[in-house]
Structure formats: structure tokens, C-alpha cells
């Protein structure tokens, strides 16, 4: 039976959720089939850390605002969180900033994974450089099949305990919400209007990549959210749809 993998990354396979009745999904999230890269190629990428250990990814929206996934911030206090920015390695280099506050989307549902997006406010502002840059939010979705990239420090095989020290990325192609929900793939009605998908043969995000960026055309189009396994041929990776959720991110960033 397929496991529903919610791309969280903090752990190997903690249970958490979405649909088929009686099937509890795993918290998961990794770059499968990817390549090592450096932060200068993905300067908006951050490592969200719980008690000093990599937990999820995220994206720099402004000097003190990070965008990540709501499922990354369940049952956790801001005081236990920090962000490492500007480093190719999650465990060293760059700068570390404490988390002052965060807000999950009020409509987030752990059973359906709708509205899986959150905003973090840092206790101190990041200084922008070649290795730390903000990324703009998509205003519309790229066309089905458009080139995209996803990055992170998640595990490199499904169910693995270990994560790479160096940032990884993989090139994928956008699968539109309507296409992802169609009979061409296996999700059906589980794909909702706050989701967008991406896929490539043998490539995907997985444990540890949750909350991280899906980028196409130089803008943030998705936030790593969930999927059935990692890199399963009939099940693309599923992401929070940034274009659809953009107004919430902007208003929350201005008020948190």
C-alpha cells in the first residue's frame, strides 16, 4: 500500500496525514535523483532548524520574513526554532537567526493538506549578499510542462535517516493542478485548488525538503508539501500553490 509522504524532513517516518481512509501518511521530504549545488545558485534557500537540527526548508521573502510549509510548524514553539541562511551546508556557515514568531495559514488542514503554507518572522534581519537574496512570489502559475527546480537538504532516498550536508537540487517540470488531478495521475480529488504539482522521471523532493522552494522563471511558484512516496512515476510531488496563496503571504508578512 502506498505511503502518503508529507515532505517534512525532520524525521524518518513519523505518521501524519492525508486521505485514503485508514492510511496514515508519513512525515517525509527529500531531493531524489538530484545533484549537489551551492547556495549562490539558490540564495533564497534556508534551513529551518529545530533545536539546532535541520527540520525543513524555506524561502527568503524579505530581510526578516521566511515562507515555509504549515506542516513544518505543528506542535513547535518559536523559541525552539532558528534559520540558517547563506550557506551551502545546513550545519555550518552563513548566518543563523532566531525565529521571533510564525503563523500558519488559518485554513491549513492536516488531513487534506490544503493551504499548507506558513510565514516566519525572524528576530533579526538578514543582510542580503550573493548568498542571501529574497525571491519574488509568483503572480500566476507557469504552463503545464514548464521547467522548474526544487532544492533542499532532504534525504536522498525514501525512508532514509540521513540527510546530505550539502545543498541538493533537482530539475523538474510543472504539472498543472488540473492535470495533476486528472486520470493521467493517481491522486484524483486529493489535489485541491491550493496545490500545484511537479515531476520528472526518477526525481522528486522528499524527507527534509518540506517547506522548501519550487522555482520556475525566477519566482517562487510552490512550497514543498506532500506526495505518495518520492519519485513514484504516477504520483508527482505536490506543492502549496504560491500564486493562489500569494495574497495571504503578503498580508501575513505585513502583520505578523
UniProtKB/Swiss-Prot annotation:
It comes from the Eukaryota. Gene3D superfamilies: Trypsin-like serine proteases. The gene is alphaTry. InterPro entries: Peptidase_S1, Peptidase_S1_PA, Peptidase_S1_PA_chymotrypsin, Peptidase_S1A, Trypsin_dom, TRYPSIN_HIS, TRYPSIN_SER. The keyword Chaperone does not apply. Residues 1-22 form the signal peptide. The active site is at residues 71, 116, 210. Residues 23-30 form a propeptide. This is Trypsin alpha.
